[in-house]
Amino acid sequence: SLSDSFMSSLEHNGVYQLLDPVSGEAIEDIPAEPIFEAIVDASWRNGDPGVIFADTIARDNPVPELGQFGAVSGCGEQIMIEHESCFLGSINLAAMITHQQQNPASVDWEKLGDTVDTAVRFLDNTYEASTFASEKIARVSKLGRKIGLGVMGLGDAFYILQIPYNSEKAVEITREIVAYIKRRAYSCSEALAKEKGSCPVFSSASHAHSRRNATLTTIAPTGTISMIAGCSAGIEPVFRLVYLRRLASGKHLLEVNRNFIRKAFEAGLDIPHIFKDLIRGHKLDELKSVPQHLKQVFVTAQDVSAEWHLNIQRAAQQHTDNAVSKTVNLPCNADRREIRQIYLKAYQMGLKGITVYRDMSRDNQPLSCSGDSSLLDAWLKANGY
């Protein structure tokens, strides 16, 4: 958790006050630079810690009368006051794209809007359907009835739309989609307030617009639920077109991107040969048999620069009540200076937090490519290749 004071001290090579996290009392003045260097070094070594920018978060608190934020979820997307909880859900954007033979793919805004309405009502109902860990948690949580509706499958949606993730068009579409979801969610929450009553914190005259929920949108990483939905995670680019997912048991699960398979089949490409090259760690851009227009669209996490990761995150954050969980993927040979610049740039862009991960910085990372093609061979055989 990095404050404005810390970041200012870092910029001017100065000191900042180290505070007791319980009492808030200043303990001592210490230089900011060595602390920041330690954070950067740890992130370079294994991806932890991610950072959040505490004062940026505090300035965007929609209901400060509830209290100051005291905790953040493990992936940085949901900020809460003490004893508060929040219910999250995510819409699969890949399922919100309409694609007809005669027309280019486009966002199905009507379907997306109907899904938002259903999701907001569903998430709000969880307050009555759930059993809370304590009466205090139940009471504090119901003061704001916060929900966090987010998205997943953005990377796959771009594939269907034939838009490169690392493009201004992708940034524009991200902004449009997330802004639309927020507007629709707010409208639904206002309708719910008329039907069922507003949340207690909005009952006061200080709030001109009554809503059922103090906050409505959050973008979580969705690393697990996106597996169930069969789409890319959160607002991340697709990790790889074919890769291995390491399970808790130590076994591996093969993941293949079916949007790429469909386009490769339409182009008459040798899918088994391409996938065998990719599982060995080659990039799509290196394969001469793949047309240039497919290389431009089917970019993966390893192809996206830090700049585009941050641009997409900012586009989403601008229209998200809470925060956006986002990881900047870096190659194995990335150095500490790159991570330092990512953290500084994220702060300057007004992001609420950011995480970086350098490929192979952990011995047993969950997602990877491997020279072992046995799982791919079995998959190709099972699918008739």
Language-model features: where?
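Glycine- and acidic
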Residues: Q17-E25, L93-E110, F132-K142, Y159, ...
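Structural signal for hydrophobic packing residues in well-ordered secondary-structure cores
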Residues: F6, L10, G14, I39-W44, ...
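Conserved active-site and cofactor/substrate-binding residues in soluble primary-metabolism enzymes
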Residues: S1, S5, I27-I35, G70, ...
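Function-dense linear segments that define catalytic or interfacial modules
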Residues: S43-S141, G153-A157, C231, E236-R258, ...
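Catalytic alpha/beta core of large soluble enzyme barrels
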Residues: G70, G74-I79, G89, L123-E128, ...
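Conserved, charged catalytic cores of large soluble enzymes
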Residues: S1-N61, E65-G67, S90, T98-N103, ...
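Internal maturation/activation junctions in enzymes
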Residues: V22-S23, T115-A138, K142, L161-T222, ...
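A glycine-rich phosphate-binding loop feature that marks nucleotide/adenosyl-phosphate handling sites
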Residues: S1-F6, F53-V63, K136-I147, V171-I177, ...
